[in-house]
Amino acid sequence: MNPEEFILELSKHNFELSDKQKQQFKLYFKYLIEVNEHVNLTRITEENEVYLKHFFDSVTPLFTFGEVFKDGATLCDVGAGAGFPSIPLKILNPTLKVTIVDSLAKRLTFLKNLIEKLGLTDVELVHGRAEDVGQNKLYREKFDLVTARAVARMSVLSEYCLPLVKKGGYFIALKGPKAEDELDDGQKALEVLGGKLVKEEELTLPHSKEERTLILVKKIKQTPKKYPRQAGTPRRKPIH
């Protein structure tokens, strides 16, 4: 998917990119590749691949679960790495107020510089493990939306993300193909942490055979105080 095809696909979903937005994606690609030479941010470096598997992939929730992206919504991105999905979402939806949580300082330095280069406002960077941030009252149950892309299995991911979602808000997981087993496996965790599965959408990225699953979970009750548990515990002993 080259930049022109990217723009065309977005227009099919009623997103007409301004010159500024086109330029932001172009700069994003350029800076990602530049920094990736000395900081390990991504294995995907070819322009068409970045536009498809990073940029387009990141914005699929906007047209799959568009109804939850209210103007001025607060969004927390857990383990964003090189800024996916939150930075592409922010470029397309500038009213979003974004908080990015990542445990690696090098990635956050990249993101800090990227945000400046792209001229983005209302983006906060938090250095820490999701388990610790989820127990911090500055962030716990404060967000309308929490996203995570390819971070961990649903049973683990729910414990990272749901404590950050405010009651009535949503957790959006961007997964690969055939996430059915993961969802079954993660059902207990969703219940325990106060979430309820609303929708699961399977899609294929355009001009490719790349299959994806998007999962939408609503926070229907508060997360018990003991969650998230200590850093490392959710991965070692997922809720079952």
Curated annotation (Swiss-Prot):
Specifically methylates the N7 position of a guanine in 16S rRNA. InterPro entries: rRNA_ssu_MeTfrase_G (IPR003682), SAM-dependent_MTases_sf (IPR029063). S-adenosyl-L-methionine binds at G79, F84, A130, E131, R149. One of its GO terms (cellular component) is cytosol. HAMAP family: 16SrRNA_methyltr_G. Keywords: Cytoplasm, Methyltransferase, rRNA processing, S-adenosyl-L-methionine, Transferase. Belongs to the methyltransferase superfamily. RNA methyltransferase RsmG family. This is Ribosomal RNA small subunit methyltransferase G. Its main location: cytoplasm. Gene3D superfamilies: Vaccinia Virus protein VP39 (3.40.50.150). It is found in: Cytoplasm. GO terms for molecular function: rRNA (guanine-N7-)-methyltransferase activity. Its EC number is 2.1.1.-.
